[in-house]
Amino acid sequence: LQQKAFAYLHQSALDEYKEILKAQKDGVKFTGVSGSILQYLYLIAISGEQVPAANKAAYTYYLSKVGELLTSPSMDTKAIAAIVLDKAGRKKEAQEFVASLKEHLTKTDEQGMFFAFNENPYTWGGMQMQAHVDVMEALEQTGGNTDTVEEMKLWLLKQKQTQQWNSPVATADAVFALLMKGANLLDNQGDVRIVIANEVLETVSPSKTTVP
């Protein structure tokens, strides 16, 4: 099934490449790559899929254009581009994307690290949760960002506490991110103490209980 899926993706990417070459002959200029092609490159990067001989020229062309996405306002686009470049051995270019992503992060003691955009999240790269998780994956895959990833996990947990993860997809994304390498925050339950009128409701973590 995977082979059939990749066969379809390879053919689609090749067809798009041929259309680009045709348009370029007519003077049309292209910047970056389309969203579908970026996803195609990402799947190759994370799966280790071998690029067919017929697609080599197309793949090389697409890869050469990924760096032009550095000016994109979309955080998840930059995150995916960083992974693609890193896996392709273009470490320096990948780190430029990582640096750009980090520049947009905000940090607070309570919330950890997150993107504090005031605009509608759709204007800066899709659903906020998805973009946050995509960036976490990029930082994890490119290495050397353990502390930042852990801080970003904290924001995910705070979202669950304050407003819930807003869809099954968001929930899956969040759980995937929380189970990345590093501290498993899902195991760290902690204690909760709530006072309602004169009544105290309190949970106690297992580490604080004693066996008689």
Predicted features and spans:
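Large, well-folded core regions of big proteins
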Residues: 1-212
